[in-house]
Design a protein with these regions (language model features):
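Active-site-proximal beta-alpha core segment in soluble small-molecule metabolic enzymes
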Residues: 1-166
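Catalytic palm active-site di-aspartate
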Residues: 169
Length: 169
């Protein structure tokens, strides 16, 4: 995410996507010229109106909270939509050498280990016009080494295989 208009404009000109975590950042990305379909919308502080607008217009929206799953029911049933979901991950278990000492689960997303992720995915799948398109896994690490990203990818593959998911991203 970046809230510097000149930087966003340059990134848009280069064909990059904007990653936003709030209404303000979403509006700024649109103001500098990003197409809605070139926005990735993450974070637990989404407002309902912007959340629905982003989904309706093809943005990559990653669901972070249970209330966002409920909001999917307000989408027009005559159209199909795609969303992603944020996985709550414990970096200390996945990549201990890259985690801060004593680090536990993230406070964002849905935990695979306790069944919360599968339950959330099942609720999304009850919305017949909404397809789960991807997983979002993010966690700040001490090292930002290739190893941490490799371990997160392995974890994502484990989830995909375990839950039998067919995803686009």
């Amino acid at each position: 995410t970046n809230s510097l208009p000149y930087m966003l404009h340059m990134l848009n000109e280069l064909g990059c996507y904007a990653e936003v975590v709030s209404y303000t950042e979403y509006a700024l990305a649109l103001q500098v010229g990003f197409e809605k379909s070139h926005i990735v919308y993450n974070g637990p502080a989404k407002d309902k109106e912007t959340f629905l607008d982003a989904i309706k217009n093809g943005a990559y929206v990653n669901i972070d909270t249970k209330r966002e799953i409920e909001w999917l029911n307000d989408l027009n049933k005559q159209h199909s939509y795609k969303v992603g979901i944020r996985v709550n991950l414990n970096l200390g278990k996945i990549s201990p050498e890259d985690a801060k000492e004593g680090e536990s689960d993230s406070r964002f997303g849905f935990s695979f280990e306790n069944g919360e992720l599968e339950e959330a995915i099942n609720k999304i799948q009850l919305c017949k016009n909404v397809k789960l398109g991807g997983l979002h896994l993010h966690r700040t690490s001490l090292t930002r080494s290739l190893n941490v990203y490799r371990n997160i990818c392995k974890y994502a593959i484990r989830i995909i295989n375990s839950l039998g998911l067919e995803l686009d991203y």
